[in-house]
Design a protein with these regions (language model features):
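N-terminal beta1-alpha1 ligand-phosphate binding loop
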Residues: 2-28
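FMN-binding flavodoxin-like domain, especially the glycine-rich phosphate-binding loop
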Residues: 16, 24-34, 46-160
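Short acidic active-site motifs
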Residues: 38-43
Length: 160
């Protein structure tokens, strides 16, 4: 099973989650954890599983993740199982700032549009998009999030 976990990270939090996911998949053969800046769309062909992660920046994925996903040819992920995750604030933190809560209700987080784009490119979504929580803009990850990421990865494996 050839699996890639592709991520972007601004302050390191999404990278930590990506590594926790990749390490949980580690008993699987051929697991690669790759920063988006090191990925070309043609490298994604022939994968069994592709997991993509991004911090939520202005209610969407980073520009680098968006560019990569847009550059994948139509049906370029046909036959590939896919999943998406993001890092974000907790709902209780968002609710403290009324305007932020309003925008989140309208625009959401990064994981859903990534999952939608992966499906548009022919991928088969194996689990709903997932969010992992940070305590502030620069982090840190909240306690237990790395373990939750590893558990989520095990759920992904169970779909194979």
């Amino acid at each position: 099973m050839k699996t890639w976990v592709v991520y972007d990270s601004v302050f390191g939090n999404t990278g930590q989650i990506a590594r926790a996911i990749g390490n949980a998949l580690g008993s699987q053969e051929d697991v690669e954890i790759v920063r988006v800046s090191d990925v070309k769309p043609e490298q994604l062909t022939g994968l069994t599983l592709l997991i993509v992660g991004s911090p939520t920046r202005q209610f969407r994925p980073t520009g680098a993740i968006t560019s990569l996903l847009k550059s994948i040819p139509k049906d370029g992920l046909r036959g590939v199982k896919v999943a998406a995750f993001d890092t974000r604030f907790t709902v209780s933190e968002i609710e403290k700032v009324r305007i932020l809560a309003f925008f989140v209700r309208i625009f959401g987080y990064a994981a859903k549009p990534m999952a939608d784009r992966l499906e548009k490119k022919g991928g088969e979504l194996v689990l709903p998009p997932e969010g992992f929580y940070v305590g502030d803009t620069e982090g840190p990850l909240l306690e237990g999030e790395l373990e939750r990421a590893a558990d989520w990865a095990k759920q992904v494996i169970a779909t194979q």
